[in-house]
Protein backbone atom coordinates (compact mmCIF):
# COMPACT_ATOMS: atom_id res chain seq x y z
CA UNK A 1 0.00 0.00 0.00
CA UNK A 2 1.44 3.36 -0.98
CA UNK A 3 1.97 6.21 1.46
CA UNK A 4 -0.53 8.28 -0.50
CA UNK A 5 -3.25 5.64 -0.22
CA UNK A 6 -2.71 5.41 3.53
CA UNK A 7 -3.05 9.15 4.04
CA UNK A 8 -6.05 10.33 6.05
CA UNK A 9 -7.48 13.83 6.15
CA UNK A 10 -6.05 15.64 9.16
CA UNK A 11 -8.14 18.03 11.22
CA UNK A 12 -7.93 19.45 14.74
CA UNK A 13 -11.01 20.51 16.68
CA UNK A 14 -10.77 22.15 20.10
CA UNK A 15 -13.48 22.43 22.73
CA UNK A 16 -13.87 24.23 26.07
CA UNK A 17 -16.75 22.22 27.53
CA UNK A 18 -16.95 20.28 29.79
CA UNK A 19 -13.20 21.05 30.07
CA UNK A 20 -10.51 22.02 27.52
CA UNK A 21 -9.83 19.18 25.06
CA UNK A 22 -8.96 18.58 21.43
CA UNK A 23 -9.64 15.87 18.86
CA UNK A 24 -7.07 15.47 16.08
CA UNK A 25 -8.42 13.09 13.43
CA UNK A 26 -5.79 11.69 11.10
CA UNK A 27 -2.92 12.37 13.49
CA UNK A 28 -1.45 9.08 12.24
CA UNK A 29 -2.04 7.29 8.94
CA UNK A 30 -3.93 3.99 8.89
CA UNK A 31 -0.93 2.14 7.48
CA UNK A 32 1.40 3.62 10.08
CA UNK A 33 -0.93 2.55 12.88
CA UNK A 34 -1.03 -0.99 11.53
CA UNK A 35 2.77 -1.11 11.39
CA UNK A 36 3.08 0.23 14.95
CA UNK A 37 0.80 -2.56 16.19
CA UNK A 38 2.66 -5.20 14.19
CA UNK A 39 6.08 -4.06 15.38
CA UNK A 40 4.95 -3.82 19.01
CA UNK A 41 3.62 -7.37 18.87
CA UNK A 42 6.71 -8.64 17.04
CA UNK A 43 9.48 -6.94 18.97
CA UNK A 44 8.12 -6.74 22.53
CA UNK A 45 7.53 -9.79 24.69
CA UNK A 46 4.09 -10.01 26.28
CA UNK A 47 5.73 -10.88 29.61
CA UNK A 48 7.41 -7.46 29.64
CA UNK A 49 4.03 -5.68 29.75
CA UNK A 50 2.36 -4.77 32.99
CA UNK A 51 -1.19 -5.98 33.56
CA UNK A 52 -3.28 -3.24 35.15
CA UNK A 53 -6.92 -2.35 35.69
CA UNK A 54 -8.30 -5.76 34.72
CA UNK A 55 -7.81 -6.16 30.99
CA UNK A 56 -5.10 -3.69 30.04
CA UNK A 57 -1.46 -4.56 29.37
CA UNK A 58 0.95 -1.63 29.09
CA UNK A 59 4.55 -1.07 28.05
CA UNK A 60 5.97 2.16 29.58
CA UNK A 61 8.29 4.26 27.44
CA UNK A 62 10.81 4.20 30.31
CA UNK A 63 11.26 0.42 30.33
CA UNK A 64 14.12 -1.64 28.93
CA UNK A 65 11.61 -3.52 26.79
CA UNK A 66 10.46 -0.26 25.22
CA UNK A 67 14.09 0.65 24.52
CA UNK A 68 14.44 -2.68 22.69
CA UNK A 69 11.30 -1.87 20.70
CA UNK A 70 12.78 1.47 19.63
CA UNK A 71 16.00 -0.24 18.59
CA UNK A 72 14.06 -2.72 16.44
CA UNK A 73 11.32 -0.57 14.88
CA UNK A 74 11.79 2.49 12.69
CA UNK A 75 8.06 3.26 13.03
CA UNK A 76 8.30 3.45 16.80
CA UNK A 77 11.45 5.57 16.60
CA UNK A 78 9.61 7.98 14.31
CA UNK A 79 6.63 8.17 16.67
CA UNK A 80 8.93 8.69 19.66
CA UNK A 81 10.68 11.53 17.84
CA UNK A 82 7.39 13.15 16.87
CA UNK A 83 5.87 12.98 20.34
CA UNK A 84 8.99 14.48 21.91
CA UNK A 85 9.29 17.24 19.32
CA UNK A 86 8.84 20.93 20.18
CA UNK A 87 6.11 21.04 17.53
CA UNK A 88 3.97 18.42 19.30
CA UNK A 89 4.28 20.18 22.66
CA UNK A 90 3.52 23.55 21.04
CA UNK A 91 0.42 22.10 19.35
CA UNK A 92 -0.92 20.91 22.70
CA UNK A 93 -0.10 24.15 24.52
CA UNK A 94 -1.46 26.45 21.80
CA UNK A 95 -4.61 24.49 20.97
CA UNK A 96 -5.56 24.05 24.62
CA UNK A 97 -4.59 27.68 25.33
CA UNK A 98 -2.32 26.80 28.23
CA UNK A 99 -0.50 29.61 30.05
CA UNK A 100 2.57 27.56 30.94
CA UNK A 101 6.19 27.73 29.79
CA UNK A 102 7.46 24.16 29.79
CA UNK A 103 11.08 23.02 30.03
CA UNK A 104 11.16 19.44 28.62
CA UNK A 105 13.51 17.03 30.38
CA UNK A 106 14.39 13.33 30.23
CA UNK A 107 14.72 12.22 33.86
CA UNK A 108 12.97 8.89 33.27
CA UNK A 109 13.57 8.42 29.55
CA UNK A 110 17.26 9.35 29.39
CA UNK A 111 19.06 6.79 27.22
CA UNK A 112 22.39 8.63 26.96
CA UNK A 113 24.73 10.46 29.29
CA UNK A 114 26.83 9.31 32.21
CA UNK A 115 23.97 7.92 34.31
CA UNK A 116 22.27 6.02 31.48
CA UNK A 117 24.34 2.78 31.74
CA UNK A 118 23.72 2.61 35.50
CA UNK A 119 20.00 3.22 35.08
CA UNK A 120 19.70 0.57 32.37
CA UNK A 121 21.56 -2.02 34.47
CA UNK A 122 19.17 -1.36 37.34
CA UNK A 123 16.13 -1.70 35.07
CA UNK A 124 17.38 -4.88 33.42
CA UNK A 125 18.05 -6.40 36.84
CA UNK A 126 14.46 -5.72 37.87
CA UNK A 127 12.70 -6.55 34.59
CA UNK A 128 10.01 -9.25 34.99
CA UNK A 129 10.93 -9.78 38.67
CA UNK A 130 8.12 -9.29 41.23
CA UNK A 131 9.37 -7.35 44.23
CA UNK A 132 8.47 -10.20 46.63
CA UNK A 133 10.85 -12.47 44.68
CA UNK A 134 13.61 -9.91 44.27
CA UNK A 135 17.06 -10.44 45.75
CA UNK A 136 18.62 -7.95 48.15
CA UNK A 137 20.79 -6.77 45.25
CA UNK A 138 17.72 -6.11 43.08
CA UNK A 139 15.94 -4.28 45.91
CA UNK A 140 19.06 -2.16 46.34
CA UNK A 141 19.09 -1.41 42.61
CA UNK A 142 15.44 -0.33 42.76
CA UNK A 143 16.13 1.94 45.73
CA UNK A 144 19.15 3.48 43.97
CA UNK A 145 17.18 4.01 40.76
CA UNK A 146 14.36 5.81 42.57
CA UNK A 147 16.80 7.99 44.53
CA UNK A 148 18.52 9.04 41.29
CA UNK A 149 15.17 9.93 39.72
CA UNK A 150 13.97 11.96 42.72
CA UNK A 151 17.24 13.91 42.92
CA UNK A 152 17.16 14.72 39.21
CA UNK A 153 13.50 15.73 39.37
CA UNK A 154 14.14 18.13 42.24
CA UNK A 155 17.28 19.58 40.64
CA UNK A 156 15.80 20.15 37.17
CA UNK A 157 12.49 21.28 38.62
CA UNK A 158 14.21 23.89 40.79
CA UNK A 159 16.33 25.19 37.90
CA UNK A 160 13.26 25.49 35.67
CA UNK A 161 11.28 27.28 38.38
CA UNK A 162 14.05 29.87 38.82
CA UNK A 163 13.72 30.55 35.08
CA UNK A 164 9.95 30.93 35.27
CA UNK A 165 9.36 27.54 33.63
CA UNK A 166 7.87 24.18 34.56
CA UNK A 167 10.11 21.13 34.20
CA UNK A 168 8.15 18.40 32.44
CA UNK A 169 8.64 15.06 30.77
CA UNK A 170 6.52 13.23 28.22
CA UNK A 171 5.71 9.91 29.87
CA UNK A 172 3.56 7.45 27.97
CA UNK A 173 2.92 3.78 27.33
CA UNK A 174 1.77 1.49 24.56
CA UNK A 175 -1.36 -0.28 25.79
CA UNK A 176 -3.53 -3.14 24.65
CA UNK A 177 -6.98 -3.48 26.21
CA UNK A 178 -9.34 -6.44 25.87
CA UNK A 179 -12.80 -7.56 26.94
CA UNK A 180 -13.63 -6.47 30.49
CA UNK A 181 -11.44 -3.37 30.48
CA UNK A 182 -13.25 -0.38 31.98
CA UNK A 183 -12.32 2.85 33.79
CA UNK A 184 -14.47 4.59 36.34
CA UNK A 185 -15.17 8.33 36.21
CA UNK A 186 -12.00 10.08 37.38
CA UNK A 187 -9.52 12.84 36.75
CA UNK A 188 -5.84 12.09 36.24
CA UNK A 189 -3.18 12.34 38.94
CA UNK A 190 -1.70 15.57 40.24
CA UNK A 191 1.55 15.70 38.25
CA UNK A 192 -0.11 15.31 34.85
CA UNK A 193 -0.79 18.60 33.07
CA UNK A 194 -1.95 17.43 29.63
CA UNK A 195 -3.26 13.92 29.02
CA UNK A 196 -3.42 12.36 25.56
CA UNK A 197 -4.54 9.17 23.84
CA UNK A 198 -3.66 7.97 20.34
CA UNK A 199 -5.83 5.19 18.95
CA UNK A 200 -4.09 2.69 16.67
CA UNK A 201 -7.28 0.89 15.63
CA UNK A 202 -11.01 1.50 15.42
CA UNK A 203 -13.60 -0.27 17.53
CA UNK A 204 -17.32 -0.46 16.87
CA UNK A 205 -19.57 1.48 19.23
CA UNK A 206 -21.46 -1.74 19.99
CA UNK A 207 -18.24 -3.36 21.32
CA UNK A 208 -17.62 -0.75 24.01
CA UNK A 209 -14.36 1.03 24.80
CA UNK A 210 -15.56 4.58 24.10
CA UNK A 211 -13.92 7.50 25.89
CA UNK A 212 -16.58 9.36 27.87
CA UNK A 213 -16.30 12.98 28.99
CA UNK A 214 -18.36 14.05 31.99
CA UNK A 215 -19.58 17.26 33.56
CA UNK A 216 -19.83 17.62 37.34
CA UNK A 217 -23.29 18.53 38.63
CA UNK A 218 -23.38 22.19 39.77
CA UNK A 219 -22.79 22.63 43.49
CA UNK A 220 -20.92 19.34 43.94
CA UNK A 221 -17.34 19.50 45.27
CA UNK A 222 -14.67 18.25 42.88
CA UNK A 223 -12.80 15.14 43.98
CA UNK A 224 -10.48 12.84 41.99
CA UNK A 225 -13.09 10.08 41.68
CA UNK A 226 -16.62 11.50 41.95
CA UNK A 227 -19.81 9.58 42.49
CA UNK A 228 -21.31 8.70 39.07
CA UNK A 229 -24.64 10.11 40.28
CA UNK A 230 -22.93 13.52 40.57
CA UNK A 231 -21.84 13.53 36.91
CA UNK A 232 -23.55 14.09 33.57
CA UNK A 233 -22.33 12.49 30.35
CA UNK A 234 -21.28 15.29 27.98
CA UNK A 235 -19.70 13.43 25.07
CA UNK A 236 -18.76 9.94 23.95
CA UNK A 237 -15.75 9.48 21.64
CA UNK A 238 -15.63 6.13 19.85
CA UNK A 239 -12.00 5.12 19.10
CA UNK A 240 -11.04 5.73 15.47
CA UNK A 241 -7.75 4.65 13.94
CA UNK A 242 -5.13 7.41 13.90
CA UNK A 243 -7.07 9.81 16.14
CA UNK A 244 -5.41 11.79 18.92
CA UNK A 245 -7.47 13.04 21.86
CA UNK A 246 -5.83 15.38 24.39
CA UNK A 247 -7.14 17.39 27.30
CA UNK A 248 -5.99 19.68 30.07
CA UNK A 249 -5.98 17.89 33.41
CA UNK A 250 -8.10 20.23 35.49
CA UNK A 251 -9.97 19.58 38.75
CA UNK A 252 -13.09 18.82 36.68
CA UNK A 253 -11.52 16.94 33.74
CA UNK A 254 -13.67 13.90 34.43
CA UNK A 255 -13.54 11.05 31.98
CA UNK A 256 -14.14 7.32 31.90
CA UNK A 257 -13.83 4.37 29.55
CA UNK A 258 -16.88 2.33 28.67
CA UNK A 259 -16.38 -1.39 29.31
CA UNK A 260 -15.09 -3.34 26.32
CA UNK A 261 -17.65 -6.07 25.68
CA UNK A 262 -16.61 -7.49 22.30
CA UNK A 263 -15.13 -10.96 22.83
CA UNK A 264 -12.67 -10.52 19.96
CA UNK A 265 -12.07 -6.80 20.50
CA UNK A 266 -8.61 -5.50 21.30
CA UNK A 267 -7.94 -1.79 21.53
CA UNK A 268 -4.39 -0.70 20.78
CA UNK A 269 -3.47 2.79 21.90
CA UNK A 270 -0.91 5.11 23.43
CA UNK A 271 -1.74 6.76 26.72
CA UNK A 272 0.53 9.55 27.91
CA UNK A 273 0.86 12.91 29.58
CA UNK A 274 2.95 16.03 29.75
CA UNK A 275 4.04 15.39 33.32
CA UNK A 276 5.49 18.03 35.65
CA UNK A 277 8.44 16.71 37.62
CA UNK A 278 8.04 18.85 40.73
CA UNK A 279 4.91 20.16 42.38
CA UNK A 280 1.25 19.84 41.56
CA UNK A 281 -0.72 20.91 38.53
CA UNK A 282 -1.89 24.40 39.49
CA UNK A 283 -5.32 23.81 37.91
CA UNK A 284 -6.20 21.13 40.45
CA UNK A 285 -8.15 23.05 43.06
CA UNK A 286 -9.96 20.14 44.68
CA UNK A 287 -9.16 19.40 48.32
CA UNK A 288 -8.30 15.75 47.72
CA UNK A 289 -4.88 14.96 46.30
CA UNK A 290 -4.22 12.15 43.84
CA UNK A 291 -0.51 11.43 43.82
CA UNK A 292 1.16 10.32 40.59
CA UNK A 293 2.52 6.78 40.86
CA UNK A 294 6.12 7.33 39.74
CA UNK A 295 6.86 3.64 40.32
CA UNK A 296 5.31 2.86 36.94
CA UNK A 297 8.26 4.59 35.28
CA UNK A 298 11.11 3.03 37.28
Residues covered by each model-derived region:
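Fe(II)/2-oxoglutarate oxygenase catalytic core
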Residues: 1-298
Amino acid sequence: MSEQSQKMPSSIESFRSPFPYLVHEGFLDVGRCQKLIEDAELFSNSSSRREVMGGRALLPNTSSAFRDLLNSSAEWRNLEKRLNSPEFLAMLVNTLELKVHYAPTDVYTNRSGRLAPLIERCRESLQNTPLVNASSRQVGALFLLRIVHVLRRVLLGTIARLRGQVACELLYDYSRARIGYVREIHRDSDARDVVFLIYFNSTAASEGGALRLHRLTPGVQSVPRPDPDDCLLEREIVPEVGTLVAFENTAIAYHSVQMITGANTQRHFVYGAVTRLVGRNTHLHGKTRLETDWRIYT
